[in-house]
Swiss-Prot record:
Residues 1-38, 93-96, 126-128, 146-159, 254-295 are cytoplasmic. Its main location: membrane. This is Voltage-gated potassium channel. Pfam families: Ion_trans. The chain crosses the membrane at residues 39-63, 68-92, 109-125, 129-145, 160-184, 222-253. Residues 97-105, 196-208 dip into the membrane without crossing it. InterPro entries: Ion_trans_dom, VG_K_chnl.
Length: 295
């Protein structure tokens, strides 16, 4: 009988602990599969873009307290998404501390805009106006940092996304934009969006940047949604057009033959059985003899 069963009769604590670690490792791998999915990476890039829009709107527009609270809540949700992506990339690197040192420029993008506004108001109440100016400079730095985060995220996602990913992203942009604008604009008597069809028409026109101008948002939050739909629509449509042109190029010109790198060759050889390896060596020798005989 093992020591652990003698100490804990009828159960194996260490075995359960090992199984728990194995299950945890499997869950981490599953989380990795989710985080590295092209649509998730595209969603992270859109979250970075929307976070830039939120900070720009908060910095340039005079919003009432109710709208500011909603804006800060949206920003907090976006920052949580960016934090999750950053934490996963740091874990995946194998050296989280080293990764943080290399990506210090991304840290300002992870600061909620509401926290900066809270600190700024507190410092203004104490009369520390120089520090208030410093915080306003940090807000500009926040915009720049989140903008660079968006560019790096969209570049990473562009290598993996396919046609149906982009088509789905365009459709989701239209549907979510229509839903959001309808919820925000319908109660306003001055808004021209009076039905679901008006909202859907507005979302399609805005996402494709046609902009007829017959249906426009009237509320500040509606205008923020309009900016988000325009920018996300432009990004998705640009990538979609590039993907379609690449597909036609492959059809007309043909795909290049994949090269066999030394790493792929070593992996192929290591996966062979003894008989397959011997057959592989004999084939190579026959090819060498054939090549020498043709010289």
């Amino acid at each position: 009988m093992s020591v652990e069963r003698w100490v804990f009769p009828g159960c194996s604590v260490m075995a359960r602990f090992r199984r728990g670690l194995s299950d945890l490792g499997g869950r981490v791998r599953n989380i990795g599969d989710v985080m590295e999915h092209p649509l998730v990476e595209l969603g992270v890039s859109y979250a970075a873009l929307l976070s830039v829009i939120v900070v720009v709107v908060e910095y340039t527009m005079q919003l009432s307290g109710e709208y500011l609270v909603r804006l800060y809540l949206v920003d907090l949700i976006l920052v949580i998404i960016l934090w999750a992506d950053y934490a996963y990339r740091a874990y995946k690197s194998g050296d989280p501390a080293g990764y943080v040192k290399k990506t210090l420029y991304e840290i300002p993008a992870l600061v909620p805009a509401g926290l900066l506004a809270l600190i700024e108001g507190h410092l203004a109440g104490l009369g520390l106006f120089r520090l208030v100016r410093l915080l306003r400079f940090l807000r500009i730095l926040l915009i720049i940092s989140r903008g660079s985060k968006f560019l790096s995220a969209i570049a990473d996602a562009a290598d993996k996304i396919r046609f149906y990913h982009l088509f789905g992203a365009v459709m989701l942009t239209v549907l979510y934009g229509a839903f959001a604008i309808y919820i925000v604009e319908y109660p306003d008597p001055n808004s021209s969006i009076k039905s679901v069809f008006d909202a859907l028409w507005w979302a399609v026109v805005t996402a494709t940047t046609v902009g007829y101008g017959d249906v426009v948002p009237a509320t500040p939050i509606g205008k923020v949604i309009g900016i988000a739909v325009m920018l996300t629509g432009i990004s998705a449509l640009t990538l979609l057009i590039g993907t379609v042109s690449n597909m036609f190029q492959k059809i007309l010109v043909g795909e290049p033959e994949p090269s066999c790198s030394p790493a792929k060759l070593a992996e192929m050889v290591s996966s062979m059985s003894e008989e397959e390896f011997e057959e592989f060596v004999r084939t190579l020798k026959n090819l060498r003899r054939l090549e020498n005989s043709m010289k």
